[in-house]
UniProtKB/Swiss-Prot annotation:
UniProt source species: Arabidopsis thaliana (Mouse-ear cress)
Swiss-Prot/TrEMBL keywords: Apoplast, Glycoprotein, Glycosidase, Hydrolase, Secreted, Signal
Annotated glycan sites: 469
Pfam families named among the record's database cross-references: BetaGal_gal-bd, GHD, Glyco_hydro_35, SUEL_Lectin
Signal peptide region: 1-32
Protein name (Swiss-Prot/TrEMBL): Beta-galactosidase 1
Cellular-component GO terms for this entry: apoplast; cytosol; plant-type cell wall; plasmodesma
Domain SUEL-type lectin residues, every copy: 761-847
PANTHER family: BETA-GALACTOSIDASE RELATED (PTHR23421)
Gene Ontology MF annotations: beta-galactosidase activity; carbohydrate binding
Amino acid sequence: MGSKPNAMKNVVAMAAVSALFLLGFLVCSVSGSVSYDSRAITINGKRRILISGSIHYPRSTPEMWPDLIRKAKEGGLDVIQTYVFWNGHEPSPGKYYFEGNYDLVKFVKLVQQSGLYLHLRIGPYVCAEWNFGGFPVWLKYIPGISFRTDNGPFKAQMQRFTTKIVNMMKAERLFESQGGPIILSQIENEYGPMEYELGAPGRSYTNWAAKMAVGLGTGVPWVMCKQDDAPDPIINACNGFYCDYFSPNKAYKPKMWTEAWTGWFTKFGGPVPYRPAEDMAFSVARFIQKGGSFINYYMYHGGTNFGRTAGGPFIATSYDYDAPLDEYGLERQPKWGHLKDLHRAIKLCEPALVSGEPTRMPLGNYQEAHVYKSKSGACSAFLANYNPKSYAKVSFGNNHYNLPPWSISILPDCKNTVYNTARVGAQTSRMKMVRVPVHGGLSWQAYNEDPSTYIDESFTMVGLVEQINTTRDTSDYLWYMTDVKVDANEGFLRNGDLPTLTVLSAGHAMHVFINGQLSGSAYGSLDSPKLTFRKGVNLRAGFNKIAILSIAVGLPNVGPHFETWNAGVLGPVSLNGLNGGRRDLSWQKWTYKVGLKGESLSLHSLSGSSSVEWAEGAFVAQKQPLTWYKTTFSAPAGDSPLAVDMGSMGKGQIWINGQSLGRHWPAYKAVGSCSECSYTGTFREDKCLRNCGEASQRWYHVPRSWLKPSGNLLVVFEEWGGDPNGITLVRREVDSVCADIYEWQSTLVNYQLHASGKVNKPLHPKAHLQCGPGQKITTVKFASFGTPEGTCGSYRQGSCHAHHSYDAFNKLCVGQNWCSVTVAPEMFGGDPCPNVMKKLAVEAVCA
């Protein structure tokens, strides 16, 4: 995944590759059970329309994986796609880690056990809004290295790790050619735009990477995404919000979409993006309509950036991504259900879709049909209305069809509509965070960091140092400390005009302490990580200690020349307003300390937390910077996902039983425009936004599997100052459920009943409502059959309303976990307005 959706898409085509390289392709294609042709990926000789979804194993827990995979399969997926995260698997050179939520083999085997395929994106560059793009930071310090180009040291390391992963998969017989689930692999990632910048070295590197990958003999095809000149036999694939315009670079390669972006990432300081289900479905249907055969949702489950894995910088801890399965693993409705219905409709068309290319038929200025036919007589059609503002009535095959704005109707038999991308049959679930009562409340203890105690663990040198090279990314924190002598005759001591301290930093945030007191803070943003602190500071006669806590908020994950990236206070650092004018502090002696004292003592762990004396009760200070807080609690009953509400805190990090939930920063409020958003029209990452003026992220996921029945240790490090008494444990659950369905809305169930011959008359659709596990429908908040207006949570009656609209739901739904009601006039006391297109809107409360 790249952070720049509009990067250049067209790259100069490459020259032909060697005969040996082509021979590798021929061996793979002929002998392997997975191959491809111009139309699709073929498995055991059979063309397949494949629906895939990204689930990144480190962004959830092993205990969550089976349920996530099950829900993905239930949602209609054929394939799970994941990156491989090099920095998680090789944290230091030659020291590998494949345990816990980095147990890649276990994850792949769970996918296999579910009956799904897997697309393994080895990279090993992943971008993914992941720290340093997935590269281990130690790569920076290999002599002569230059990342992602024709560079010997880099290529040697890349080949070594890629070979390690491939051999691991082979040893477990996990490639499809061995009977395993892996049907595709990916080498590199979104390299095309960078290759264009680099020129010849970039093209040489692309050719080398492709040849190296194919030479590993996996027996399955390799993919490169956003790589228009991917050498044969590599398939070049598309990433984006829409990919219907895309064509592979050779006529004998299939049209693949490796990243269909289901939403966008959240950044600290930014609103929360979302993508309407109708537009997501529209983009996928349009891709399939125009010849696409493989589509992967990025993300299908986004999950959580635990620990310090978030990149960016400034990527939030939540990687929810508005995915069909939310950060906690719950179905996001209606997106999950609407896409499930889409996948079922596409699969009904598969016999015709895989038979060849479509015939295009214009139906109007903004309307067209794409028709697929097979030699055996199968016929499927996609009717599209690209007008974002108005309905269209079109004629096709001697029938008339009404197409909503910006929508596509799917006709598996070239006659009957079973699905329209703008007509949502799935329920909408409104979620809430409910405070979990903790017996006796959370009783906090506190320990305050003191920069003056760092001398024994520090080093001193003249001038300013770069942060990443100094910390080696072992901590977010680096102290810059120096002394400033102020003469007693300085004018500001008498007139009260404070001297101004100016500190320039390459990123990402800083807190400035003068003589042990917090003087102020400054921070950048994802779009502008560099920052300047400029403020009047309270100095006294004699020696003054300036201590700057420089903070990294995730290392960048996208861009060229990783080896050159920097962070921290690079200067200049200066004082203005002294008798002598400006005093440059940059080249005097500075003392440095990597990390916090609390980190070196492991205060976040069960054992380390007992190594210092903690303040209790009335001695626990509020709004105090550089403070560690700890408390214990018992695990709440039930299975509902849990989170901590950090709304009362500023910025820092959180741990549960020694495991990091990630960075918290609720004090960074979201800046943006959260106006009403329509599903119609071209989507972009800033089109649909929530949370403007509020915390970018308030709640932080607590995996249930990290908890013990009692005595769970919660530790918070707070940089700015907050009120720990405002921290609460919450559970995520369904608040209310809604359905919004037209009287004659097409459904797959009704189509299949007709096709089976079990019924021979038109059938009305049904409204389905279901609360969460353990919940029941308690009340019907709103119900109207007629012309209701508004959206879920804010419905209102229109000019036409059936007065008995509530009756069926009160009778069939109240007291039940789930229910279904036929959307027909007789269910609501008769037709309230004949000759008017009616619909049902209902909202029911769950508890």
